[in-house]
């Protein structure tokens, strides 16, 4: 089952509206009858239901699906449905919700419907096996309705008038002989009685199709009969009616086929075709040979009485009615009819539908009884046409098609949808009759009279048939005078006044002036006046028009085809872009092929080149900025790396010039002492100048932030420059200084506690043991091992009471709880980790934090809050540390530097300095120590502490800085701090680079 075109267009459009409250849970998922949307979502229909394609969303119907129809969706309605679906979707409703079903059903109720023939009606097996399957298609209700109708109206047949009157239907030529081979047998006996009676009914209210399509005839009351009728029964007319009724059915015992004479719409609510232009009311047969005798009159009254008694039975079957009709026919037909008496004229579509639904033998012509009273049959003929005219004009309920007259605007919808393949083989070879032009195909006249169309093809032919508009009197007369045919039925094209053409443009919305200009150009192109087009309207980007009646016999299809063929000329004349043109019969679009739009590739080429140019410009600018920045850093690195080689007078002169400029603007009362010798004592560093508060020790040390906050004087920078010059003049100075540092021996250096047997498993390296006088003491009562030992040393800076750092080894699996206990008891908030977890398969540090969630280490619960990777060199983790004994919680931040390996140095000083700035920015304003650890807590940890301590002294405004003396101060508190000469040289380079950045940031 393919999706309809309007729905495909609806899904391609883009989607905004306030979100409403979601539907209650009770409103979801309930199986309701007739649910919509089964084409788009499975499971909507119940087990006894099937999904019927209604042309929009699909509707669930009980099996068998009888009420089949399609909606006619105009472009405006399609846009409205799209907006409704957007609202429901954004609000959270689905097809399962009752609210969705009610909203969509309400919207669809406003759309016009086109009723379809039942899908099984076109099955050849059904038509060929009518006798075996008819019990499946007719319910007992139709038989009861027939019996009640006979019981109500047969007594009133005695009111038929006997007096012949003048021809009451002058519009139709009654003397015209019926077309040979046509079947005029009515659908049932009631239709024949209605056609041959002079009953008149008040105008029936036009009821909505198809609810009252099969309105019971019993609604008419006896007092509705016209008082004009006489009180006596016209026996000849009743005889003719009953005779024709019985004659139309093939004889045979136990023949159930007369059931097909009951209205076929009882099978399924199919759309009935309104009486076509060529339809004529059936005529009784012509002159009969024998007249009725008085015995026949008596017999007739007796049979009518028996028939009325039979009608009293509520469950009277149609087979019994046929038996009664056989009895009447047997009494009438005293002599067989000789010669071929052909059936008289038939309706255009209703009779052909009988041929399609009836078995094959029902397509043959049947003879009607002949009576020898020509006057009686003449009167029957006159009354028949008069009654037919009255029923047509007043919409009698006897005609199921009457309610359809007010919906004549749907006449073209099914016709436009019918593909050429669905047409019967007769129409493919015989051609099509045009009602207005009265032209007939030559091939049709040459067809053999006995050719029998295939019943299933005939049903397919009329499956998409829609009710026609009744023409004026002249057209009705012409339609009644159709040419003879051999039992075939011509397809009638819809009238041109009912077709709408459209031209779709690229302007949305299209102004009415532009639309009128476009139609004027089309009229000029066709060499017709502007009045040639009627009812010109602009709908969105399209112009909709109708083609008036014209002597050129030009149709809407001709106009739309001309618009397609001359598309370029129209676009040039109007300045519009024509996208499509086609025929629009009442909301359904029949598109015509037209040349595809040739996309202007020039604009895409221009846009492509512009995009490429922009991308290249951005890349070029980025590359230039990177090169400039990299070049400046490269030059600085070259200067620093050449300190031990060829001396550079440029660097020295630059630093000295900066110093002179800085000194020139200083107050005159400030005097500096001579810098003639280096200070080697630790006491001179610790006692120099007033000390700021402990909270001021933190420094961001950033090239953009730290110099602005630094208290370092230009003279300090000059001192650092002089220190570097001293190393440059004496190439072996750095190595000798390192040898002196290696020979330095701390006093005291006792490590008895760390060497105890119970503490030996807690040491990662025997070369780095804590001094007894400088170690972190844990509270043994809170320790899981009841010990106060951990391999960690406090590092003092300027305040011997408050350590600035805690240098410790990387935790072992057995010391993780001790590590977190030290973090808690020291009040630490920042951890600096300078080692990866493993190097070349050697474990450097235990994974002492959870990867996700939380872990408990003794009485401390560590919860990982976040983990951010700042760059490829380091990342930052945030923890919640909770003491399960006191239920207190603190926040701890870990800075993990990844690219510094054991006994080595980082690849660049820049990455470590940037890492230090991040650490100090987080630490700013705190007075707690920073825990620094690597693997053994000495080499990499000592280098980092040395760099940070020297730079912090410079930021506080220290007048004298001695890096070697500072390292000795660190080794007094923990052995092995800065383990290699490369690490010491790296510390000097990092300090020099940071000083250089500070000097550049100072105001000139």
Curated annotation (Swiss-Prot):
Residues the record lists as Phosphoserine modifications: 340, 424-425, 681, 687
Motif (Tyrosine-based internalization motif): 655-664
InterPro entries: IA-2/IA-2_beta, Prot-tyrosine_phosphatase-like, PTP_cat, Receptor_IA-2_dom, Receptor_IA-2_ectodomain_sf, Tyr_Pase_AS, Tyr_Pase_cat, Tyr_Pase_dom
GO molecular function list: protein tyrosine phosphatase activity
Signal sequence, start to end: 1-27
Entry annotated with the keyword Disulfide bond: no
Compositionally biased spans, kind Low complexity: 694-710
Segments of skewed composition (Polar residues): 677-687
Stored SMART domains: PTPc, PTPc_motif, RESP18
Biased composition range(s): Acidic residues: 419-430
Location, primary (coarse class): membrane
Side Cytoplasmic, residues: 625-1004
GO biological-process terms attached to the record: insulin secretion involved in cellular response to glucose stimulus; lipid metabolic process; neurotransmitter secretion; regulation of secretion
Annotated GO CC locations: endoplasmic reticulum lumen; presynapse; receptor complex; secretory granule; secretory granule membrane; synapse; synaptic vesicle membrane; terminal bouton
Region (Involved in localization to secretory granules): 1-409
Record region (Disordered): 274-294, 333-360, 393-459, 665-710
Membrane topology: Single-pass type I membrane protein
Domain Tyrosine-protein phosphatase: 734-994
Extracellular topological domain residue ranges: 28-603
Residues with Omega-N-methylarginine modification: 259
Binding site for substrate: 902, 934-940, 979
Residues glycosylated per entry: 553
UniProt-annotated location(s): Cytoplasmic vesicle, Secretory vesicle membrane; Cytoplasmic vesicle, Secretory vesicle, Synaptic vesicle membrane
Function: Plays a role in vesicle-mediated secretory processes. Required for normal accumulation of secretory vesicles in hippocampus, pituitary and pancreatic islets. Required for the accumulation of normal levels of insulin-containing vesicles and preventing their degradation. Plays a role in insulin secretion in response to glucose stimuli. Required for normal accumulation of the neurotransmitters norepinephrine, dopamine and serotonin in the brain.
Name of this chain's protein: Receptor-type tyrosine-protein phosphatase N2
């Amino acid at each position: 089952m393919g999706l309809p075109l309007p729905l495909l267009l609806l899904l391609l459009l883009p989607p905004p509206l306030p979100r409403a409250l979601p539907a209650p849970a009770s409103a979801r998922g309930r199986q309701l009858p007739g649910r919509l949307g089964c084409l788009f979502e499975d499971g909507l229909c119940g087990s006894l239901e099937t999904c019927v394609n209604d042309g929009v969303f699909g509707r669930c119907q009980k099996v068998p699906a009888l009420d089949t129809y399609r909606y006619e969706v105009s472009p405006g309605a399609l846009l409205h449905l799209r907006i409704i679906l957007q609202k429901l979707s954004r609000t959270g409703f689905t097809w399962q919700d009752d609210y969705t079903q009610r909203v969509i059903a309400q919207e669809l109720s406003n759309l016009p419907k086109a009723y379809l023939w039942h899908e099984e009606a076109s099955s050849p097996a059904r038509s060929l096996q009518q006798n075996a399957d008819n019990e499946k298609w007719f319910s007992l209700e139709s038989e009861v309705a027939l019996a009640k109708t006979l019981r109500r109206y047969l007594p009133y047949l005695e009111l038929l008038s006997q007096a012949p009157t003048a021809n009451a239907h002058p519009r139709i030529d009654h003397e015209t002989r019926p077309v040979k081979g046509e079947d005029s047998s009515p659908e049932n006996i009631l239709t024949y009685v209605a056609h041959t009676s002079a009953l008149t009914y008040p105008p029936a209210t036009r009821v909505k199709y198809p609810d009252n399509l099969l309105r019971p005839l019993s609604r008419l009351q006896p007092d509705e009969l016209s008082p004009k009728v006489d009180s006596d029964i016209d026996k000849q007319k009743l005889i003719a009616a009953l005779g024709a009724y019985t004659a139309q059915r093939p004889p045979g015992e136990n023949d159930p086929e007369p059931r097909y004479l009951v209205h076929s719409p009882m099978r399924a609510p199919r759309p009935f075709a309104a009486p076509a232009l060529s339809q004529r009311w059936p005529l009784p047969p012509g002159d009969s040979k024998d007249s009725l005798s008085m015995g026949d009159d008596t017999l007739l009254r007796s049979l009518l009485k028996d028939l009325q008694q039979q009608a009293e039975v509520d469950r009277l079957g149609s087979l019994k009615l046929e038996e009664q009709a056989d009895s009447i026919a047997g009494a009438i037909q005293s002599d067989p009819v000789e010669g071929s008496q052909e059936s008289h004229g038939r309706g255009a579509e209703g009779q052909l539908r009988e041929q399609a639904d009836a078995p094959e033998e029902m397509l043959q012509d049947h003879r009607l009884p002949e009576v020898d009273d020509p006057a009686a049959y003449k009167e029957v003929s006159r009354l028949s046409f008069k009654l037919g005219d009255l029923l047509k004009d007043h919409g009698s309920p006897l005609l199921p098609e009457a309610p359809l007259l007010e919906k004549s605007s749907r006449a073209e919808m099914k016709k436009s949808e019918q593909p050429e393949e669905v047409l019967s083989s007769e129409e493919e070879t015989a051609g099509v009759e045009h009602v207005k032009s009265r032209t007939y195909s030559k091939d049709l006249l040459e067809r053999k009279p006995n050719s029998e169309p295939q019943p299933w093809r005939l049903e397919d032919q009329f499956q998409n048939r829609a009710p026609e508009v009744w023409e004026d009197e002249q057209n009705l007369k012409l339609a009644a005078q159709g040419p003879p045919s051999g039992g075939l039925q011509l397809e009638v094209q819809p009238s041109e006044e009912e077709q709408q053409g459209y031209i779709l443009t690229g302007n949305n919305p299209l102004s009415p002036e532009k639309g009128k200009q476009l139609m004027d150009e089309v009229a000029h192109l066709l060499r017709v006046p502007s009045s040639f087009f009627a009812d010109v309207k602009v709908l969105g980007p399209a112009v909709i028009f109708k083609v008036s009646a014209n002597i050129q016999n030009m149709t809407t299809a001709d106009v739309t085809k001309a618009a397609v063929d001359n598309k370029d000329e129209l676009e040039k004349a109007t300045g519009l872009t024509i996208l499509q043109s086609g025929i629009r019969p009442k909301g359904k679009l029949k598109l015509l092929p037209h040349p595809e739009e040739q996309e202007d590739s020039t604009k895409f080429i221009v846009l492509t080149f512009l995009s490429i140019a922009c991308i290249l410009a951005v890349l070029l600018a980025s590359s230039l900025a990177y090169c400039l920045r990299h070049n400046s850093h490269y030059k600085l690195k070259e200067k620093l790396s050449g300190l031990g080689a060829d001396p550079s007078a440029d660097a020295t002169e630059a630093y000295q010039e900066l110093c002179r400029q800085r000194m020139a603007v200083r107050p005159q009362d400030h005097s500096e002492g001579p810098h003639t010798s280096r200070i080697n004592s630790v006491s001179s560093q610790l006692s120099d100048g007033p000390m700021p508060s402990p909270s001021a020790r933190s420094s961001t040390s950033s090239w953009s932030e730290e110099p602005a906050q630094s208290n370092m004087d230009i003279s300090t920078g000059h001192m650092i420059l002089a220190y570097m010059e001293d190393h440059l003049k004496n190439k072996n100075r750095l190595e000798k200084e390192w040898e002196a540092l290696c020979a330095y021996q701390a006093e005291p250096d006792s490590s008895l506690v760390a060497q105890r047997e119970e503490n030996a498993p807690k040491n990662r390296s025997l070369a780095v043991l804590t001094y007894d006088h400088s170690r972190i003491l844990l509270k043994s009562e809170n320790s899981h091992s009841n010990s106060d030992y951990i391999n960690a040393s406090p590092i003092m800076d300027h305040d011997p009471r408050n350590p600035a750092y805690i240098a410790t080894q990387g935790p072992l699996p057995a010391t993780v709880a001790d590590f977190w206990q030290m973090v808690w008891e020291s009040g630490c908030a920042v951890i600096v980790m300078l080692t990866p977890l493993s190097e070349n398969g050697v474990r450097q540090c235990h994974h002492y934090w959870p990867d996700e969630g939380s872990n408990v280490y003794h009485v401390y619960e560590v919860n990982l809050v976040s983990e951010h990777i700042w760059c490829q060199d380091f990342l930052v983790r945030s923890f919640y540390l909770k003491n399960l004994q006191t239920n207190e919680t603190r926040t701890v931040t870990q800075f993990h530097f990844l690219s510094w390996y054991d006994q080595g140095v980082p690849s660049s000083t820049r990455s470590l300095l940037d890492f230090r700035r991040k650490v100090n920015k987080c630490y700013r304003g705190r007075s707690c120590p920073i825990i620094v650890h690597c693997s053994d807590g000495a080499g990499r940890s000592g280098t980092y502490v040395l760099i940070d301590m020297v730079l912090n002294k410079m930021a506080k405004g220290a007048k004298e800085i001695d890096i070697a003396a500072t390292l000795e101060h660190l080794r007094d508190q923990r052995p092995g701090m800065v383990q290699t000469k490369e690490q010491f040289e790296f510390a000097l380079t990092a300090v020099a680079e940071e000083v250089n950045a500070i000097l550049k940031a100072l105001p000139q």
